[in-house]
Design a protein with these regions (language model features):
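C-terminal motif of bacterial Sec signal peptides marking the signal peptidase cleavage site
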Residues: 17-21
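Bacterial lipoprotein signal-peptidase II cleavage site
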Residues: 23-31
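All-alpha RGS (Regulator of G-protein Signaling) helical domain and cognate RGS-like helical scaffolds
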Residues: 35-235
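Bacterial N-terminal signal peptides that target proteins for export
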Residues: 2-9
Length: 235
């Protein structure tokens, strides 16, 4: 089995695209351990690890949580994550169009529920949706627009490159959610959605790594620390 390492992190950093809204690259961000208690069952996970929000159950759980006061940092996080989850969906849809691979087809459906879960929070706090009527591949945030364009270009080179892009998207997602999660000040509704988004990204990262293994490729983490990556893959 061969090891493929593409220095995409360098390309993303050089383009100013990795975690720009959070003030830097992924270095220094350590993922919190997965929540070990029994949170509300608002996600469904199938045998392949595809992780989708059950939006009806999520609505019920959100309705039971008192509405708090949202800070500017929390609002920024929701706006960014709404579009970043859309980015994952749109990238996977485009890469599935190019390569007709079930991993993209299945995870793109899950990602659609992820961005809708964040939309429920935007609506709950009366925050204007940055997605609006934007088409696939179109983003209000210029950082995410540039990242989408770059990731699709990288994933267009080959199926292996496309699967590596998928794994990188999930790495970036995990780091961004963890960063925004540290800004949440007592709003349990936001914490619940973010923690479940992280569960989804962990599962989807594992799915892309398995798909690469079937192509005889050993994926090396591009953004997560080796310890965080190993904990996810071995759990």
């Amino acid at each position: 089995m061969k090891t493929r390492v593409r220095k995409t992190l360098f390309l993303l950093v050089a383009s100013g695209l990795v975690l720009a809204a959070c003030g830097g690259t992924s270095s220094g961000v350590t993922l919190a351990p997965p929540v070990q208690n029994n949170p509300p069952a608002v996600i469904d996970v199938d045998a392949d690890g595809n992780t989708s929000f059950n939006l009806d159950r999520l609505r019920d759980e959100l309705a039971a949580i008192p509405l708090g006061t949202i800070t500017a940092a929390e609002e920024d996080g929701l706006l960014y994550m709404r579009e970043e989850e859309k980015l994952a969906h749109d990238v996977y849809v485009e890469l599935n169009r190019l390569w007709q691979h079930n991993t993209f087809a299945n995870i793109s459906l899950s990602e659609l529920t992820h961005t809708e879960a964040v939309l429920l929070l935007l609506d709950r706090y009366s925050i204007t949706d940055p997605v609006g009527l934007n088409a696939a591949g179109v983003f209000t945030d210029p950082t995410l627009q540039g990242l989408y364009d770059l990731l699709v270009a990288l994933g267009s080179a080959s199926l292996i490159d496309a699967l590596m892009v998928g794994a990188e998207v999930e790495e970036i997602d995990l780091i961004d959610i963890q960063t925004w999660l540290t800004d949440v000040e007592g709003n349990d509704d936001i914490v619940m959605v973010y923690e479940n988004l992280m569960k989804g990204s962990r599962n989807h990262l594992r799915a892309f790594v398995r798909a690469l293994e079937r192509q005889n490729v050993v994926y090396q983490p591009q953004h997560l620390s080796q310890d965080d990556y190993d904990e996810i893959i071995n759990s």
